[in-house]
C-alpha cells in the first residue's frame, strides 16, 4: 500500500500566480444535486432535493479557485433553509474561497397541501422554486423565484360566444428581490388569487364544476393577469424589486400568449 512521505507537501496549484492577468467574473460548480430541507410558512420542515450553482469572482493574478470548497459548503449547511440562513451561507462561501464577490442559486420542487373547494379532499401540488443570492463589494441581494401554474380564461372568447369560452393552463413566474424573510406560500397565494382560477392536484366532480364556473366568472387576458399580480407586489413592502411573467398556453393556438412587467421600487422612490 502506498504511503505518503510526511516530509512531502502537496502543491496548491490553484493558488499559484497566473501570468495572463485576466480576471474571471464567475467560476465554480454547476448543477450539483444535493438534499435540503425548507422551512414552511406554518413552521414545519419540508425535505426536497436542490440543484445548486455556486461561483465566485476570481482575481486576475490567481490561477484557479478551490472547487472542493463549494461542495464542502453544502455538506456543512444541513439546517432548514431560510432567507437569513441563505445570506449567512453566501457570506461563508466568500470567506472560504477568499473572494470579494460570489453567487449561490438553488432550484427545488416545493409542495403545498391543498384542500379542494367543495369536496374538501386534500392533495399536494408542486411548485418550482429558486432561491438566489449574490454578494459584491460588501452588498448582498437575495431573490426568491416561484413558478405558479394557474388557469386563465379569455374575456374576448366569453364575450363573443353564446356559451363557453376557451381556457388554458398558465404559468405565472414571480422573481422577487427581498427586503426580508418572505414565505414561498405568500408569492404562490398572490399568483393564484389573481388568476381566473387556481389549480389542485385532486378534484371530485363537484370541485370540477366549481373550478369551471369560477374561471368563467373571472376571465382575464394575460395582460390582466400580470397587472393584477403587479399591484399586489407593489403593495408588499417585503418585495424591493421584481420581474413578473405570465405565459398562457393557448388552447386554440399552437403558440403561447406572454406578458412581462419589471419594476425596481428603489428607482421610483
UniProtKB/Swiss-Prot annotation:
Enzyme Commission no: 3.5.4.16
Pathway terms, separated by semicolons: Cofactor biosynthesis; 7,8-dihydroneopterin triphosphate biosynthesis; 7,8-dihydroneopterin triphosphate from GTP: step 1/1
GO biological process: tetrahydrofolate biosynthetic process
Catalytic activity: GTP + H2O = 7,8-dihydroneopterin 3'-triphosphate + formate + H(+)
Signal peptide: none
GO MF entries: GTP cyclohydrolase I activity
Record site feature (May be catalytically important), residues: 154
Keyword Hydrolase listed: yes
Family as reported in the entry's similarity comment: Belongs to the GTP cyclohydrolase IV family.
PANTHER family the UniProt entry points to: GTP CYCLOHYDROLASE MPTA
General function of this protein: Converts GTP to 7,8-dihydroneopterin triphosphate.
Annotated protein name in UniProt: GTP cyclohydrolase FolE2
UniProt source species: Burkholderia vietnamiensis (strain G4 / LMG 22486)
Classification lineage: Bacteria, Pseudomonadati, Pseudomonadota, Betaproteobacteria, Burkholderiales
Amino acid at each position: 500500500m502506498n504511503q505518503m512521505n510526511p516530509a512531502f507537501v502537496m502543491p496548491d496549484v490553484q493558488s499559484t500566480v497566473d501570468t495572463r492577468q485576466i480576471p474571471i467574473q464567475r467560476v465554480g460548480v454547476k448543477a450539483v444535486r444535493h438534499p435540503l430541507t425548507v422551512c414552511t410558512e406554518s413552521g414545519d420542515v419540508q425535505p426536497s432535493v436542490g440543484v445548486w450553482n455556486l461561483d465566485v469572482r476570481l482575481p486576475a493574478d490567481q490561477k484557479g479557485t478551490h472547487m472542493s470548497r463549494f461542495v464542502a459548503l453544502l455538506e456543512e449547511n444541513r439546517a432548514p433553509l431560510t432567507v437569513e440562513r441563505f445570506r449567512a451561507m453566501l457570506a461563508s462561501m466568500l470567506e472560504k474561497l477568499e473572494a470579494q464577490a460570489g453567487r449561490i442559486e438553488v432550484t427545488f420542487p416545493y409542495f403545498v397541501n391543498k384542500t379542494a373547494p367543495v369536496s374538501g379532499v386534500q392533495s399536494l401540488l408542486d411548485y418550482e422554486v429558486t432561491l438566489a443570492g449574490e454578494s459584491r463589494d460588501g452588498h448582498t441581494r437575495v431573490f426568491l423565484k416561484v413558478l405558479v401554474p394557474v388557469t386563465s380564461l379569455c374575456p374576448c372568447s366569453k364575450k363573443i360566444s353564446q356559451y363557453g369560452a376557451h381556457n388554458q393552463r398558465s404559468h405565472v413566474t414571480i422573481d422577487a428581490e427581498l427586503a426580508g424573510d418572505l414565505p414561498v406560500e405568500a408569492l404562490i397565494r398572490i399568483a393564484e388569487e389573481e388568476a381566473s382560477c387556481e389549480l389542485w392536484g385532486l378534484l371530485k366532480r363537484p370541485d370540477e364544476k366549481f373550478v369551471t364556473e369560477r374561471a368563467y366568472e373571472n376571465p382575464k387576458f394575460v395582460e390582466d393577469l400580470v397587472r393584477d399580480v403587479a399591484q399586489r407586489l407593489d403593495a408588499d413592502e417585503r418585495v424591493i424589486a421584481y420581474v413578473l411573467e405570465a405565459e398562457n398556453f393557448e388552447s386554440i393556438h399552437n403558440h403561447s400568449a406572454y406578458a412581462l412587467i419589471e419594476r425596481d421600487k428603489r428607482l421610483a422612490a
